[in-house]
Amino acid sequence: MSARCERTATGVRTVRDGRILWNLEIDTPECRPFFHPLNFPSGRTITDLRPADHIWHLAAWFSWKRINGVLYWEPADKELRGVAPEGETRVVRQEIDVGGDAACDVRLELEYGPRGEKPVVAEKRTIRVSAPKATGEYSITIDHVFTALADVTFDRTPPHGDVSKGRWGGGYAGFTLRLDPEIAKEFTVHGLSVGDSPATCTGKETRGLVFTLPKTGETLRFSQLDAPETARFYIWPDKRMVNPSPVFTGPYGLEKGKTLHLAYRLDVNVCQGT
């Protein structure tokens, strides 16, 4: 089995035996980098890009919901068809290092600010993708360091609904996975500290989740490595959206000059425990 990591016109990807294993888009219409596709070594795609119900969902991406009341998550137009929220996310610098073993390091600098105005938050993001194992398994580690350029408050739509009745929403922000609907149906989910369903994990799980395909044993492990005390996992009832929101339980304030560190890891495995 051979694998190579290569630059593309808009980002970087790893190809294994002629098939894309993972692809990172940096230069995007939304100005928000995202991974798509993320594939199992078998070739099955995990992620869903710009689904019709939420065209601003970008497979595996990071987006704040609100900063100082300004919306960064979804389009600003009432029809929710545009790509431009009220707040701008801007990639201002990128550096990509490709290893001969098909590993990859990406360093990004981003800014966040109201559209057409000065930025209020700066970010340094480091993305490390491991060289795939002989089996094709790989891991992605994403490290975010946010620096407040003014006093800021990161916020979300407050959680609402009743998980006991199978209907809930709100609380989301930050790094998010939008899962392919067919694979989401098949996945079982298990919390690393609590819960074994979307209802029992949402608002409670803090460490991570393991998604498993029972028929094949393939697993996706989504770990939260560093986050504030306000962070909790949020999962749609049908598992199509997964988000370790740093502001699930409440807003997070950051004074000018202060920093916030967030870190996550995705492990794509051919069988549980590998």
Each language-model region and where it sits:
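Beta-strand-rich N-terminal accessory domains
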Residues: 1-59, 156-158, 215-217, 273
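Extended, loop-rich substrate-binding clefts of extracytoplasmic carbohydrate-active enzymes
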Residues: 61-136
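Beta-strand elements of well-folded, non-transmembrane domains
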Residues: 110-114, 127-133, 146-150, 160, ...
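Beta-strand-rich recognition/accessory modules
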Residues: 216-274
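Extracellular/lumen-exposed scaffold segments
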Residues: 29-81, 188-205, 211
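Short, well-ordered beta-strand segments enriched in hydrophobic/aromatic residues
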Residues: 12-18, 140-148
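Short, solvent-exposed beta-strand/turn "edge" segments of beta-rich domains on protein surfaces
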Residues: 99, 129-139, 154, 164-166, ...
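Active-site/ligand-binding surface loops and adjacent short beta/alpha elements
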Residues: 151-227
